[in-house]
Curated annotation (Swiss-Prot):
The RecF protein is involved in DNA metabolism; it is required for DNA replication and normal SOS inducibility. RecF binds preferentially to single-stranded, linear DNA. It also seems to bind ATP. GO terms for molecular function: ATP binding; single-stranded DNA binding. The gene is recF. This is DNA replication and repair protein RecF. It is found in: Cytoplasm. The keyword DNA repair applies. InterPro entries: DNA-binding_RecF (IPR001238), DNA-binding_RecF_CS (IPR018078), P-loop_NTPase (IPR027417), RecF/RecN/SMC_N (IPR003395), RecF_2 (IPR042174). SUPFAM superfamilies: P-loop containing nucleoside triphosphate hydrolases (SSF52540). It comes from the Bacteria. Gene3D superfamilies: P-loop containing nucleotide triphosphate hydrolases (3.40.50.300), RecF/RecN/SMC, N-terminal domain (1.20.1050.90).
């Protein structure tokens, strides 16, 4: 899977722009606030139907305009496709090859993407919801059953919470059963996803890219290492029954997969408590690389890998090691305020961005 071109109209600081991408490394440099990150955001919006910078896509509309339009052409399984997103105050329209995409479930996974940015700090110091989102986006891009199960789970959870708020308990058991059945699949999927990521992290760590990192998955539903869905279904049933009185008082469901979390550990110590800022940034880069390899193992093809403001937290040695891995990661976009000092392949492209003007840069150090 390769992105061939990207077109932007009335998006952020871009009135109109179009860029053709290298199938390998795309290095984008320029001063701050010129539009580098906006290019990555555009690809993210096209791929996932959401932004990593705002919950309201209308905030990305060019000042004074009524809408924005994004379009990418991409090659997948030997065929070329066009994917577009139109956003105005009335809503969002997504088309693939001119056919409407009506739900995000249809969109997610069509163009797998992984983003490494400063916002990844939330995976260390943010709320549990930030870490669940990481797992949900990864698994939804790789497993159609997971994304559908997650959607049904959230619907059932909403129904149960509505009944709790209005103290209507007569049909709670119906929703409890749905939550237990759907929730067990989510929990088991998340557990094994973390275990596979841990294996990939160790492979990357063996290349001496960073310290030893481990994801410690935390769920109250897994008892004594029993990972059978039947056991987890029964455990969630039990917890929902036990917590009913408290849930009625709170008007919300206090147990289940929507309360799960994970902790990043370095050499069996909490990254949040015992790592320097530089270590944290390097370890998060490792985690995102592992995410790329996870998706690659599922699809036998690399996702689009985007790295924003790469010099903000990594030194030149770490960046060189990332670039050495780039050929195994497929198509990559990397933004920075600096011209690259590391060697790139002949098929790489270097772009400079200045006041939303994108230019091909002639500076290229070839391996």
């Amino acid at each position: 899977m390769k992105i061939l071109s990207l077109r932007l109209k009335n998006f952020r600081n871009y009135k109109e722009a179009e860029v053709s991408l290298s199938p390998d490394m795309n290095y984008i440099f320029g001063e701050n606030a010129q539009g580098k990150t906006n290019l990555l955001e555009a690809l993210y919006v096209l791929s996932l139907g959401r932004s990593f910078r705002t919950t309201h896509l209308t905030e990305a509309i060019f000042f004074g305009s009524s809408h924005f339009f994004l379009e990418m052409t991409f090659e997948k399984d030997g065929f070329c496709h066009t994917l577009s997103t139109y956003v105005d105050k009335q809503g969002k329209k997504i088309l693939c090859d001119h056919s409407p995409i009506k739900t995000l479930s249809q969109l997610i996974g069509m163009v797998p993407i992984v983003l490494f940015s400063s916002k990844d700090r939330s995976l260390i110091s943010g709320a549990p919801a930030d870490r669940r989102l990481f797992l949900n986006l990864l698994l939804s891009q790789c497993d159609p059953q997971y994304k559908h199960t997650l959607s049904y789970y959230h619907r059932a959870l909403l129904q149960r919470n509505t009944l709790l708020k209005t103290k209507q308990t007569s049909t709670l058991s119906v929703w409890d059963e749905q939550l237990a059945t759907l929730g067990a699949y989510l929990t088991v999927s998340r557990y094994f996803c973390c275990e596979q990521l841990n294996q990939l992290v160790q492979e990357l760590w063996s290349n001496s890219l960073s310290e030893q990192l481990r994801i410690k998955f935390k769920s109250s539903l897994i008892k004594q290492g029993n990972l059978s869905q039947e056991a987890i279904i029964e455990e969630l049933r039990k917890q929902l029954t036990t917590a009913l009185h408290r849930d009625l008082e709170l008007g919300t469901t206090s147990v289940g997969p929507h309360r799960e979390d994970f902790t990043l550990m370095i050499n069996d110590l909490s990254v949040a408590q015992f790592s320097s800022e530089g270590q944290k940034h390097s370890l998060l880069a490792i985690l995102r690389l592992a995410e790329c390899l996870y998706i690659k193992n599922i699809y036998n093809a690399c996702p689009l890998f985007c790295m924003d403001d790469i010099h903000a937290g990594l030194d030149n040695h770490r960046i060189s090691q990332l670039l050495d891995l780039a050929p195994t990661l497929g198509q990559t976009l990397m933004t920075s305020t600096n011209i690259p000092h590391q060697s790139l392949s002949e098929t790489s492209k270097i772009f400079s961005v200045n006041q939303a003007q994108i230019s091909i840069h002639s500076h290229l150090i070839v391996n």
